[in-house]
Amino acid sequence: MLYAYYDQWSADRNLFSDLQIASSSSFSRHFQNYPVLYLDMTDFVTRYDSVNIVEHIQSDVISELKEVFPNIQHRNDRDLSDVLLDIVLQEPRQEKFIMIIDEWDAILREFKNENGVDDKYIKLLRGLFKSTNAMSTFAGVYMTGILPIKKYNTQSALNNFHEYSMVQPGPMADCFGFTSDEVRSLCAKHHMGYEPLEEWYDGYQIGGKVGMFNPTSVMIALYNQYCDTYWANSGAYDTVASYIRMNFEGLKDDVIRLLAGEACPVETSSFQNDLNVVRSKDDVLTVLIHLGYLSYDRNSRTCRIPNREVATEFKNSIVSETGWGVVATAINQSEQLLADTLASKSNSVAKAIDVIHSDNTSVLQYNDENSLACVLTIAYYAAKKDYLMIREFPSGKGFADIVLLPRPNCTQPAVVLELKYDKSADTAIEQIYDKRYAGSLSDFAGEVVLVGINYDKATKQHECKIEKLKA
């Protein structure tokens, strides 16, 4: 769209007529008024190796420029910055260039500084955009990608750009995904319900905007007419796994809490915007924010898994990762735990939770009911397929610890889990009745399963009591 807007040779002048930009006072001043250089770095990555890719970027672009502007006399026809300036100075009525670099960081992500390619590439960009030629050559430059521009020490390598990222989106926050209004409009157009898309693809909090959707997945879901995980990278679980296997202090604990639906604090400023320089838990979480696997709340400085699509990728990563055996086992056995819960097999439920707790004590330490809730959220992970799992569900006279609400087309009963620490399962059940938690589930036909779970710190055993009542 940027290319079509700026490029002086674009033919379609009606493309923007029904869009907001057409009403801007500066629209006509810039519309299709510039020669545009468009580079897709993924194209170069597929054609060249790390040894000479930077040289080929220059030579390929220069060769094409010579074909378009054959009458220019060049002082140095091997330097792209000089070639561009020569064209601007010598071509009659020549406007400055607009340059668009798509997937600017593909080289950094693909080659990971193989043969020193990172530094060569950054040097090329600095030569283009920070040289004395830059102001005379370019009317504007746009670079899109996953990562912000690489830092050297604490400064950006190209500090004359306005940078907008998942962590610092500035006024561009609306442009990082689809808004809820846009998705509702698309759902109406494609005759598909809004709620499933909200569950699967919503949840990104970008800047102050709450409720941003993954646009690619939304469009594929609308085309296919069903929701699933549609990450463009079919090896998405490998990407997550490569970072969560890093053995930084506190990382495994945070990943478990993220899987359980909790938010985790993160300090994003230390990351150097370099995938080869990941030095801490905070760097890992920051990378996952930039890659779209985590949503970032700048006010609380916390991150969380945004939606069901990403949660599925996290789960796949952990199940396939050997270093996460005990957590993977808990996830794999969670279907049986749910079945035992619905069948009122309280002893089986208590024993299963004993095993999960024992296996995970090196990762998560029990110290209160919230820690117990975190482990139980993992223990009941399979329930997310048929249930909406809500922590601290507002109901009756307080908040139930965990509630499983049946999804549409699920015929199973709702489940209320009340957790106690060093008390009793009877006390947990009594609180469900006293606080009238089940009354808030009157919209769900059939039974409601009431589950009281207590952890005894002295015996390190769990006690479970299960009752059923009509909603």
Name each model feature, range by range:
Residues 1-368, 383-386:
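Phosphate-binding site recognition
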Residues 2, 376, 400-404, 413-421, ...:
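Conserved catalytic cores of phosphodiester-cleaving nucleases, focusing on short active-site segments
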Residues 96-98, 413-417, 449:
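Structural motif
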Residues 440, 446-471:
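Domain-level recognition of nuclease-like catalytic cores that cleave nucleotide substrates
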Residues 128-135, 286-294, 377-382, 431-451:
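Metal-dependent nuclease catalytic cores in nucleic-acid-processing enzymes
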Residues 87-93, 383-410:
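Active-site metal-binding core of divalent-cation-utilizing nuclease and nuclease-like domains
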Residues 118-124, 421-438:
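Mg2+/Mn2+-dependent nuclease catalytic core
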